Amino acid sequence: MGNDLRTLSAPSLTILNNPAVIAVSQDPEGRSVTRVRRELNIAKDKYGVGEIQVWSGSLFGGDQVVLLLNAAGEDAQISASLEEIFLHDGPEGSAPQVSEEWEVYDLWGNRMDDALAQKILDADDKEVEKLWKQANWYNATEMSYKDGLKKWDERLMGKKIGKIAPGGTLSAKVKRHSVEMYRLKSIGHGGKRKVHAKEEL
């Protein structure tokens, strides 16, 4: 982090301390996400820049992370089929994961609210510890992200928002110049798979 923690704002704290997102960056598999789609024929911003991208990557335990990036000049409905999401595991829908059912977790769905974040920033050391415990916030010094993922700690999953049927599609309204981030968890079974990395992030 390149920011000054002494002048950190509440919204910034809620971004930096999101355990569901941090768990992806600390994933034991240590794999990169790959871009599976890029669209340029969309609305541009005032600088003449605009595109939509879909990124996907495998996670610990057979989970999958999916990012829907809207770098366009207006809000957009972005969809990604399981065939696209698991493109590097098998072309033209041949990946076994395409025929599975998946639970969808919004990794920003349980983000700390700004009011609590401000209380934490304003509190002294003793009060801060109390606030963290009351919030039941994930503490990586007490349990590593790897161990938390093994136990399927709900604080590392985000907010469950639905399911994707076999052969189905993930779809979301994404605000301009923003990104939505999801964890997919197979219902029934996950499993190891080959990863054919292309354009990595």
Named regions from a protein language model:
Residues 119-200:
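C-terminal beta-strand-rich structural cap/linker in extracellular carbohydrate-active enzymes
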Residues 111-117:
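Surface-exposed loop/edge segments in extracytoplasmic proteins
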Residues 1-110, 123-128, 135-151, 174, ...:
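Active-site-proximal substrate-binding groove within the catalytic cores of carbohydrate-active enzymes
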